[in-house]
Amino acid sequence: MVIDSWQEPDVPRNIAIVSTDNGKGTTIFKADNPWQGYKVPDYSCGTIKADDDSTTLYYRMVKPVDFDPNKKYPTIVYVYGGPGVRNVEAGWHYNSRSWETYMAQKGYLLFILDNRGSSDRGREFEQVTFRHLGQEEMKDQMRGVEFLKSLPYVDADRLGVHGWSYGGFMTISLMTHYPDVFKVGVAGGPVIDWKWYEVMYGERYMDTPQDNPEGYKQTSLIEKAGNLKGRLQIIIGMNDDVVVPQHALMFLNACSEKGTQPDFYVYPGEGHNMMGHKSVHLHERITRYFDDYLK
């Protein structure tokens, strides 16, 4: 026999014993909802078409507590978008992050879309971004934005975007390629130019700068610094050895030369991800930025 452990969108944990002789399972544990009795957001999952008009993409939506379809809500697109990661799963609350729940309790609507290039959908799905990271991903994310704008309860004048690492790269990419769409963005540990990123990742998906100069030029955000219009906060750890501080600092230098005004916050001594009480401080800062400029 084997032990099978899994989640469902409305069940945090199931455990069953499955017979290897006949495949029949016996449930031995089904976890109760730990949030029973609390006011919680509505978590849902759906699909839209990718920019190629044929590929199905999955999204997660977290609606505010006490949701009223007659109101218009500030909406945050949470994005990662890169290879090797997916955000939307058929697990507990569709794999929603606790920060999404917190923001929904504060009156925001959250939208998370797994664009082409993300993981576990096959080689063709992931390889569409090869040698030009960020480009197809942005097109798919903008399909998500079009979908959001079609909903009567989404305030199209109060759209925000937030992501970390590859998601930080996507956040700045979206804000500089579509400057009239996003009012506020928070980019954490963002890649700015792939030639400065670690080669075991960058060259796997981009080839070398010598073999793919046009791809590196197209995906670099340095030349896009002058396009920035909305409020953008960039956050990094000063000891980040994954996306080294050179990325953010070079982008800030380009912004100063182009006359654009992003905000910048540094965690001294921290790496690519904040840990412990610094993580709490980080999420307070991200939340405050949206409260100040989007809500």
Language-model features, listed with the residues they occupy:
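Serine-hydrolase catalytic core recognition
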Residues: 1-295
